[in-house]
Swiss-Prot record:
GO cellular component, as recorded: extracellular region
Keyword field: Disulfide bond, Knottin, Neurotoxin, Secreted, Signal, Toxin
Record protein name field: Conotoxin Cal6.34
Transmembrane segments: none
Predominant place of localization: secreted
Organism, scientific name: Californiconus californicus
Localization: Secreted
Tissue-specificity statement: Expressed by the venom duct.
């Protein structure tokens, strides 16, 4: 039961991450909340220190 709960939580987190990444707004990236922003290609203007996954512009 615990494993099922962990799996459900993981799926929810991943889904939320994809939803945020699909948002064209870079606010999440600039504040460090969006760890998926590299997939949008929209947040490269921000320094990589905000998000280790975002390359420098």
């Amino acid at each position: 039961m615990k494993l099922t709960c962990v799996l459900i939580v993981a799926v929810l987190i991943l889904t939320a991450c994809q939803v945020i990444a699909a948002d064209s707004s870079c606010w999440f990236c600039s504040t460090g909340f969006n760890k998926c922003c590299e997939s949008t290609g929209d947040c490269m203007t921000y320094p990589s220190e905000y998000n280790a996954s975002c390359p420098e512009a």
